[in-house]
């Protein structure tokens, strides 16, 4: 999306408002089992690593048991509403409500009424595939006079990138490692910090 109107507007806002910075701190939440081998499919609602650490919340594996969690609140960094995650043999799904990210000093917040991601394994030997949805999403920069909120795409293409000074916001982030596809609804990185919201993972499964 480099060079698009969204990036040009945000770039201007950053120049006026000054550099951005993530707020430090630390947090631990309900996590995936330590040292466990990743199952073929899995999902979790939110995680972060850096000065602020949030272990995967509402993690679920291939057993198909849905996991839910109440609001996640890290003052000055991120808050969410309810979280629902599901993982079955051939698909995974994550949904996070009422997302508000306060990880910028001059950009007030990135928010969305809901962020979700899903991935599926092909039944015919093809690669896994997935998608993400962002409902009511926007980025707000109140320190720039008369600067309107920038709406986020509801169904962004894979790896849609928005640059915010030293930070990078990736919508529908999709990566493949050793045959495993990881789909992250919203991924923010920069300044030694990252934040993942609505993560689904699908990998190779034995069909025998």
Regions found by a protein language model. Give the residues of each.
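Secretory targeting and sorting signals
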Residues: 1-36
């Amino acid at each position: 999306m480099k060079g698009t109107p969204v990036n040009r507007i945000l770039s201007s806002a950053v120049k006026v408002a000054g550099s951005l910075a993530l707020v430090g701190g630390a947090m631990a939440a309900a996590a995936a089992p330590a040292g466990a081998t990743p199952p073929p499919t899995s999902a979790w609602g939110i995680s972060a690593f850096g000065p602020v650490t949030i272990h995967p919340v509402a993690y679920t594996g291939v057993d198909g048991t849905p996991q839910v969690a109440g609001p996640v609140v890290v003052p000055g960094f991120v808050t969410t509403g309810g979280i629902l995650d599901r993982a079955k043999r051939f698909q995974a799904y994550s949904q996070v409500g009422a997302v508000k990210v306060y990880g910028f000093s001059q950009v007030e917040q990135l928010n969305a009424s809901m962020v979700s991601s899903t991935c599926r394994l092909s039944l015919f030997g093809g690669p896994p595939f997935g998608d993400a949805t962002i409902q009511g999403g926007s980025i707000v920069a109140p320190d720039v006079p008369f600067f309107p909120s920038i709406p986020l795409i509801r169904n962004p293409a894979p790896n849609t990138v928005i640059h915010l000074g030293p930070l990078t916001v990736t919508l529908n982030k999709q990566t493949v490692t050793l045959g495993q596809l990881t789909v992250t609804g919203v991924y923010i990185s920069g300044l030694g910090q990252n934040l993942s919201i609505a993560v689904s993972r699908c990998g190779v499964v034995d069909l025998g």
